Amino acid sequence: MPKGEGKVIAQNKKAHHDYFIEETYEAGLVLQGTEIKSIRNGRVNLKDSFAKVEKGEVFLHNMHISPYEQGNRYNHDPLRTRKLLLHRREINKLIGYTKEQGYTLVPLKLYIKNGFAKVELGVAKGKKKYDKREDMKRREAQREIERAFRERQKL
């Protein structure tokens, strides 16, 4: 793998189901030593995690990084709040988005890029139940079209 490309460690598939993703940002993570080792082993869960802007800084909450197996008593807290590294103008944009009604910050995926752990952060707006049903109908219709097309190709 070339040095610049990132290796995806974890994805938040539920985020695309529950939210409309308006915009995405790449952010670095402030981690402890045993956390990065657990991330490299793929022991991360983004399921219920979210980000908040507090006092001009962005923090990631509820991201579960399992304790490192070979770690000793100095192992990290699995659910601790982690600071995200973004440029000031990006943080200001995120502050503007989160001030609007209905927008939240959701981590979409976690990956390693040039040896550093990065999070793809999405500015998201919640879907209503009928939006989810509409998406399911659209996906099912697309599957039917592809299935019919494949059957036609066989003939």
UniProtKB/Swiss-Prot annotation:
Origin: domain of life:
Bacteria
Which Pfam family, any one, appears in the UniProt record?
SmpB
Q: Which GO terms describe its cellular component?
A: cytosol
**Role, per record:** Required for rescue of stalled ribosomes mediated by trans-translation. Binds to transfer-messenger RNA (tmRNA), required for stable association of tmRNA with ribosomes. tmRNA and SmpB together mimic tRNA shape, replacing the anticodon stem-loop with SmpB. tmRNA is encoded by the ssrA gene; the 2 termini fold to resemble tRNA(Ala) and it encodes a 'tag peptide', a short internal open reading frame. During trans-translation Ala-aminoacylated tmRNA acts like a tRNA, entering the A-site of stalled ribosomes, displacing the stalled mRNA.
**Organism of provenance:** Geobacillus kaustophilus (strain HTA426)
InterPro entries in UniProt: SmpB, SsrA-bd_prot, SsrA-bd_prot_CS
Keywords noted in UniProt: Cytoplasm, RNA-binding
Entry's NCBIfam families?
PRK05422.1 (NF003843), smpB (TIGR00086)
The name under which this protein is listed is: SsrA-binding protein
- Using the UniProt record, give the first listed, main subcellular location: cytoplasm
Q: Name one GO molecular function term.
A: RNA binding
What Gene3D superfamilies is this protein classified in?
2.40.280.10
Entry-linked SUPFAM superfamilies: Small protein B (SmpB)
Gene name as annotated: smpB
Compartments in which it is found: Cytoplasm
The family line of this record is: Belongs to the SmpB family.
One annotated GO biological process: trans-translation
